[in-house]
Regions:
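Specific transmembrane alpha-helical segments of multi-pass solute transporters/efflux pumps
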Residues: 21, 50-96, 102, 138, ...
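Hydrophobic/small/kink-forming positions within alpha-helical transmembrane segments
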Residues: 18, 22, 76-80, 84, ...
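Membrane-interface helix termini and inter-helical loops of multi-pass transporters
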Residues: 22-34, 60-61, 91, 140-152, ...
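Glycine-/small-residue-enriched transmembrane alpha-helix faces in small-molecule transporters
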Residues: 1-40, 146-173
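Transmembrane alpha-helices of multi-pass small-molecule transport proteins
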Residues: 29-81, 108-109, 162-170, 184-203, ...
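Loop-to-transmembrane alpha-helix entry segments
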Residues: 65-66, 102, 115-138, 147-154, ...
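C-terminal-most transmembrane helix of multi-pass membrane proteins
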Residues: 8, 42, 140-142, 213-215, ...
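Helix-helix packing/entry segments at the starts of transmembrane helices
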Residues: 40, 79, 83, 98-104, ...
Length: 286
């Protein structure tokens, strides 16, 4: 069982990320814009982690200045810049196209990991990658006809996939010197502070006048932000970057089931086909 724990960490992270839509939808219905949700996730995650580690693990606060560029990469490049590209893609293309462009990330991680870390590109890994991409295409509805695109939108989507993939490249460099907790904390230092330029304080005050939205925001921060980053980074310390990124493709499947169970979204055969592909992918990589 211990052998599979890192894989379970990554799958758990994907499941937590898949719940983002649950919290986002409640906040957006209350009038919260996407930019402020990014601030809540990233800066809220920083505040929570600072409080936790101040009480339990103060060693995470100490890193060498020469390693700060690594955390600029994981925090600003792979959190803030990625989010901006993804939101821009959603403005210019359909949501289905945006999602499938984002999930080119595992392919990019596999290629970059081969170049940077000399990870082998095996037949098993290529099969799992193909299954993951096929599964994501089923789940996101790209075959349903909702496929409006623009050239600029595609570039932003591919950019989002690339920036998203870079977390799995930058983080292992940090893990060579620090614990997963330290890597996650300093990722949020850069990502949280780097998100503040997106803040719309007036909008946030209006939404949080309803105390229930504060609880929703806390759920977003704990369940779909801090916890998955801790789980994924801990798994990444023991699993190849390429495999980890492919396994994280479980996220859109979970997101689809959250929509079905929480919001009564229609059950689609495509979702179950996607789930089958992703589960087969996990079995192949076991």
């Amino acid at each position: 069982m211990k052998k599979y724990l890192p894989y379970l960490n990554i799958l758990g992270a994907a499941a937590c990320w898949g719940c983002i839509g649950l919290f986002n939808r409640f906040l957006m219905r209350a009038g919260m814009g996407a930019a402020n949700i990014v601030v809540i996730r990233n800066f809220g995650g920083l505040v929570l982690l600072t409080l936790i580690f101040a009480l339990r693990e103060r060693s995470v606060f100490h890193v060498k200045a020469k390693h700060l560029p690594i955390f600029f990469g994981t925090g600003v490049v792979s959190m803030v810049f990625f989010t901006l590209c993804y939101f821009k893609c959603q403005e210019l293309c359909s949501l289905a196209v945006s999602a499938i462009l984002l999930y080119t990330a595992p392919a990019m991680v596999v290629l970059m990991s081969a170049a940077v870390f000399r990870e082998r590109i095996t037949r098993k890994k290529l099969l799992a990658l193909a299954l993951a991409l096929l599964g994501c295409s089923f789940v996101t509805g790209v075959w349903s006809g909702d496929a409006s695109v623009t050239a600029v939108g595609v570039l932003f989507g591919l950019g989002a996939g690339f920036l998203y993939a870079l977390y799995s490249i930058f983080a292992p460099f940090g893990l060579r010197h620090y614990t997963p907790f330290t890597v996650v904390y300093w990722t949020f230092v850069f990502g949280g502070l780097g998100s503040l330029f997106l803040l719309d304080a007036g909008e946030m005050r209006t939404v949080f006048a309803d105390g229930r939205m504060i609880l929703v925001a806390l759920g977003l921060i704990v369940i779909s932000t801090v916890l998955p980053y801790l789980l994924y980074t801990n798994g990444l310390a023991r699993v190849e970057s390429g495999k980890a990124s492919i396994l994280a493709s479980l996220e859109p499947v979970v997101a689809s089931f959250v929509g079905i169970l929480a919001f009564g979204e229609p059950v689609s055969l495509m979702v179950f086909l996607g789930l089958g592909c992703i589960l087969t992918c996990v079995y192949v990589l076991r």
